[in-house]
């Protein structure tokens, strides 16, 4: 008997939630379009009198909270160009309001507002050139570090601009806080691009001797790169052949960058692309919150660890 009562209560709550969602959707559509309330109610399969009864009621505390949260949510959503899903929105809403907000509540509000995050595209696979030298996968997917500048990941990714012209972004990511330590955008995917990235990282973190993990791209297997690592007492680690998951957090960053910025725009010049990448990496390091960093941005997490 007790189970039946609980089941009935749960069913009633679900029905109320569905009705509330329908009413909110009608209200939003009626404000944003020229469609009449009568037609919207007919489409939704509800009585117009029921909708007006709901509309003229006194809003509950929960409803007023939802309205405030929706405003906060939409402000964040617009700022990031419609790229955040419910997890990222929840983190930013918690920080902005100082309230404990359940991610399921944010997901429901997103459905009411008819919004969703962008979908990541699959990464193209490329065949690497014959390596001059290789090393073992010393990192072995241990994607954690006790302090900054202990373990770095690096990789190069491709962008297009103008009339099919290509640009290449080389970056180094710190596994401690997932921050981008250094990056270089160039027109050629060559050794100087990768060498300059490492030099910038060493300038940003003088005296550091981290483990540096990469795939087996020809730049990383070159003798010149190996010498640069040895000169700075850096231990080299490489992914196994065809195992991009061995460099997972780096691949994840590329996906985030492209979904939240690159795929949303058309770039006519190298300078336009460069400006947006620079702005996004600054946003990622300083403002974009991560659940695995206790709801902090990479630089906030790094500062607390200092």
Regions found by a protein language model. Give the residues of each.
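Basic, flexible linker segments flanking DNA-binding modules
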Residues: 14-20, 41, 49-147, 243, ...
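Active-site beta-loop-alpha junctions of metal-dependent nucleic acid enzymes
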Residues: 165, 184-205
